[in-house]
C-alpha cells in the first residue's frame, strides 16, 4: 500500500477546467465512499477549493492510474482529456505535497492561511465519510503541525497579500478611488468579508452584500457596515454597482450576460469592475465581452500576487526546510509501522510452528516415547523450521554474489564471526542430531 496525491490546481489548469472538477461540500461524503467502492483505495480524503481539487489516497501501489480515471468519470469527463491537467505524487512526494499545501507554499498567494482551514475541512470530511485511516490521519496531523510551525518560525505570514487584497488592488486599476463608489459583494464567506474590510480601508462608503443566507449577510454588514440583500434582489441593485466581487459555492452561475447587459444600459455605460473569485464561476464568462464591463477571474490576480511571492522567497526557503524535516519524520514513522507489521507476521509464523510441533510432541509422549528423544526431536525440528527461510535466503544470496544481502542478514540475525573449526563442529553436531531425530521419527511413526 502506498500514498498518492492526485489533482489539479491553479498552476496546472485554468479556471474553466478547474470549475468542472469541484466537489461541493455536501457532496464530499458520497464521493469518498464512491471512490473507495470503485477503486483499491483503503483510505481517502478530498481537498477541493477554488484553486485546487486533490485526492489524497492510500491504495494498491500498482493502480494509481485508477485515481485519474475515477476523478474524470465521476465528473462525467473524458479521462484522456483530463490527464493533461493532472499531477500525481507518490510516497514521499505525496507526503511533501500535502505538507506544502497546508503551509501555503503551493498557494496562489504564498503563505496564505486560509488553505490550512480548508485542509482541516478535508480531514473532517474523510472522518465523516469513514475513509480516514491510521496512515492518512497521521499524515494530516503532521501537515497541520508543519503549517503551524511555518507560520510561527518564518516570516511567511508577515504583511500578507491575500486574494481579497489582490482583488481590491486590481479594482484600483479601474477606479482611482472608492469614496464615491458602490460595491456589491455576492457571498458572505471569509474571502468576501476580507474584501469588504479592504474596500472600507480604501474609503468605500456604499456597500451591498447579497447572499443566499440573508442572516449571514446581515452579520457581515454589522461588522463592516452596508446593506444586506437576498440573491433575488441582485438584478434590481446591480446597476448601482461600480465594483462587484462574487465568491459563492453555487454550482451554477448567479449572474448571466443578459442581466449584466441590462445593468450596463441603466448605468449609461459607466465602467463596471467585476471579479469572479468562485470556482465554478458565479458570472457567465460571456459578460466580459460587453463594453464597459471589466470582468476578471481568480486567475487574473497572478501578477498582483507575484510581487508578494518575490518578497517572501527567503521565508519560503526556511519553510521548505521545515517541510523536509517533517517529511523525514513522517516517513520514519511509516517505515517503523511497516516493520511492526513484518515483525508481527514473523513472530506469528514462529508461534504457529511451535504450536503444531508441541501437539505432535505430546502425541509422541502419550505413545510412550522417551521424553529425552521427544525433546531432542522437538528442538531440532523447531530449529529447522525457524531457520529454513533465512538459510535458503543466505544460500541464494551467496550463489548470486550478493555480499550486501549477506551482511544485512548477519546483522539482522546477530551472527558472530566464527572460525572454520567452529563451523565444522556445528555441522557435525547438526548432522548427528538430524540422524538421531530421524531414527526417532521413524520409530514413532512405525
Curated annotation (Swiss-Prot):
Pfam families membership: GlutR_dimer, GlutR_N, Shikimate_DH
Ranges where the record places region Disordered: 417-446
Keyword terms, alphabetized: NADP, Oxidoreductase, Porphyrin biosynthesis
E.C. number: 1.2.1.70
Residues the record lists as binding substrate: 49-52, 107, 112-114, 118
Catalytic activity: (S)-4-amino-5-oxopentanoate + tRNA(Glu) + NADP(+) = L-glutamyl-tRNA(Glu) + NADPH + H(+)
Pathway: Porphyrin-containing compound metabolism; protoporphyrin-IX biosynthesis; 5-aminolevulinate from L-glutamyl-tRNA(Glu): step 1/2
GO molecular function, one term: glutamyl-tRNA reductase activity
Residue ranges, compositional bias (Basic and acidic residues): 420-430
GO biological process: protoporphyrinogen IX biosynthetic process from glutamate
Active site: 50 (nucleophile)
Binding of NADP(+), residues: 187-192
Site annotation Important for activity: residues: 97
Domain of life the protein comes from: Bacteria
Domain comment (free text): Possesses an unusual extended V-shaped dimeric structure with each monomer consisting of three distinct domains arranged along a curved 'spinal' alpha-helix. The N-terminal catalytic domain specifically recognizes the glutamate moiety of the substrate. The second domain is the NADPH-binding domain, and the third C-terminal domain is responsible for dimerization.
Assembly behavior: Homodimer.
Annotated family: Belongs to the glutamyl-tRNA reductase family.
Function: Catalyzes the NADPH-dependent reduction of glutamyl-tRNA(Glu) to glutamate 1-semialdehyde (GSA).
Note: During catalysis, the active site Cys acts as a nucleophile attacking the alpha-carbonyl group of tRNA-bound glutamate with the formation of a thioester intermediate between enzyme and glutamate, and the concomitant release of tRNA(Glu). The thioester intermediate is finally reduced by direct hydride transfer from NADPH, to form the product GSA.
Record's protein name: Glutamyl-tRNA reductase
